[in-house]
Amino acid sequence: MRIFVDTGAWIAIADRNDQYAKIASQFYTDLIHQRRNLITSDLILVETFNLLSRTIGSKTTVKFGNVLKTNAFLIIEPITPLDWERGWKIFDKYDDKDFSFTDCTSFALMERLKINSAFTFDIHFKQYGFYVFP
């Protein structure tokens, strides 16, 4: 099984003071032990690193990023121009849901890669129709 990893999950894994830190770290450890393929996007990591730099500092964020780079189970997918366009259509269509554009590009990527599950604490993934964990 492949699972998409969203910004909130990465933040909770990296920041021990995050409200979801304990549950996120345990779930992440379980995924690694189960040898699950983790998929995330370049936009998710940009968002993650920007937010983490403000909360845990740049130095710790860089260390976290370097750990991610060595994770054999992590695939960082670039958002393609088609994902961007599909994301915009989702963003436009569901303007009543308060989805972020980053969420919408994630939905587009997940549709393209046929991934139906997300490691996230963001209710928007469930609202759009994906299974969410933990």
Question: For each predicted feature, which ranges?
Answer:
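Short, well-structured N-terminal submotif of metal-dependent ribonuclease cores
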Residues: 1-40, 53-67, 134
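Acidic active-site catalytic centers that drive phospho-/nucleotidyl reactions
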Residues: 6, 47, 103, 122
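Amphipathic alpha-helical segments within well-ordered protein domains
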Residues: 8, 46-50, 88
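A generic structural signal for short hydrophobic patches within well-formed alpha-helices
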Residues: 10, 45, 125-126
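Short glycine/serine- and small hydrophobic-enriched flexible loop segments
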Residues: 50-53, 111
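Short acidic, glycine/proline-enriched helix-loop-strand junctions
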Residues: 68-80, 94-96, 126-134
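Active-site neighborhoods of divalent-metal-dependent phosphate/nucleic-acid chemistry enzymes
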Residues: 75-116
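Acidic, PIN/NYN-like endoribonuclease modules and their adjacent C-terminal/linker elements
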Residues: 107-108, 112-134
